[in-house]
């Protein structure tokens, strides 16, 4: 059933929707048009790369804390693309990836990166909380990194533990 809606005349990011009594869930579809040039804003998508910032592509009800809004996010990727995200519980069926339900607060803190040219490097595979570097590039050749470059990233892991005194994560992508 189509619901009538109107953009708020003052708060440009707010919408007013007439929701019938008793409705517990809405299924919403809309298109997000990303900047294609830095003069228009932050470019987050090219023909071969995607940096999906969930907060730019979602609608949620006003009057609730983000940590109290459960979200089951899904994304449809172009054929042959791979992805990486801090979101867990990903199930892929064809080109559609469905993630486990998380609070909205977690979703917006877990961007998704995707593209056809992808490489994952284990920076610290320890059981104390593995740390991985996910690399996406415009071409396969750009995925290459020297041992010296990767060693710098590996050292940052140890330096962060020394600085903060512990690992405040189960795993880090």
What do the predicted segments below correspond to?
Residues 1-156, 162-170:
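Non-catalytic architectural context of zinc metalloproteases
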